[in-house]
Amino acid sequence: VAENVHDFAWAADHDYLHTTEQVPGGPLLHFFRKDIPELEATWNELPGYMVRSFQFMDRHFGKYPWPQYSFVQGGDGGMEYPMLTLILGNRRLGSLVGLSVHESVHSWYYGVLASNEGRFPWMDEGFTEYASSEVMQELFPRSDDPHAGSIKGYLSLVASGKHEAPSIHADHFLTNRGYGSTAYSFGEMFVHQLGAVVGETALADGLLRYFDVCKFKHPEPVDFERVMEKVSGVELDWYFDQWINTTRTLDYGIRGVLSVDGELRVELERYGDQLMPVDVMLELEDGTTKHYHIPLSLERGARDPGSEPFAFVTLEPWQWTDPTYTFMLPLSMARVGAVVLDPMQRTADVDLDNNRVDLPPGAQGFIRP
């Protein structure tokens, strides 16, 4: 008997081949496919990847609660249900694994957390995309940011002029693109970008706690917000309000860099309407880097020093009403090779051209991007 499920599906075919694979300490995975020779090689490799996927999800996003899960070859695409997914099986290995990961990860968000997909489609598809990208990075490591595509997709939507507030009901978007990009790209970007606010460690801890606290409770955005606030120690109502309920865009830039009395003066400006804290990195002439974090005053705090994989210095908060921000560092301009905003490129900044200033050797005066 299936307990705590809100949907179901079943499949049957006399010609299905059925195999199983046990996740240690977890569910029994079932695999059903047609007896087609061309599918044999990839489907024989799929179980090993799915065991690793479930183990990764259990460690990083919450414990899968049910005793089994089935991957069933269906007619087209992929569709998730509690404890089962129907997937198009005739794919290359990477594609088959990617589809299977995405559809099974839905069990955590569509299945267990079960947010209202009509009201908050990005809380299902977007969170699923974020976790799936993390899983795929574990299975097929890549050198670039596994979430970069979500920022690119969101920025493409903004540039198209079809961007609508993510708070709109799924049925009421004016275009299919607006709905799709908001549910998938924006949702993943929203979670990923939150790491630039609270730090990667707090984000990871918060996502795990979110699942444990809200499972089977149909959470809304405010529930995720409260969990992240408790984990990070900063206020996040401004982040959730502006990114979910408006179409404002983010654009912070460097106005200029200059030397004042032997010290480095950096002037920043908020060109867009969207608010965010700001990360700054200095590339020094000796090849080393220095990182600085400028909290937003609305946070009423700042992320913990150990919340990032790199050391950083926290500067005075940027008052949210001020369009500009200036800070001084006890560094000779001659020691600095470049000043960079958002060096990890975790934010959906619409204009990266003003995020970097390179300082030529011996540079003096006011240097602009």
Predicted regions and their residues:
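Zinc-dependent metallopeptidase catalytic helix centered on the HExxH motif
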Residues: 86-150, 207-208
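Active-site-adjacent bridging/hinge elements
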Residues: 27, 77-79, 102-107, 156-171
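Short acidic/polar inter-strand loop motif in beta-rich domains
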Residues: 343-353
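Beta-strand-rich binding/interaction modules
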Residues: 237, 250-252, 256-343
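Amphipathic alpha-helical substructures
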Residues: 180-272, 290
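Low-complexity, Pro/Ser/Thr- and charge-rich linker/hinge segments at domain boundaries
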Residues: 9, 360-369
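Acidic/His/Gly-enriched intrinsically disordered linker/tail segments
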Residues: 119, 125-193, 197-198, 214-215
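Hydrophobic helix-coil surface modules that form long, contiguous segments used
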Residues: 1-101, 130-133
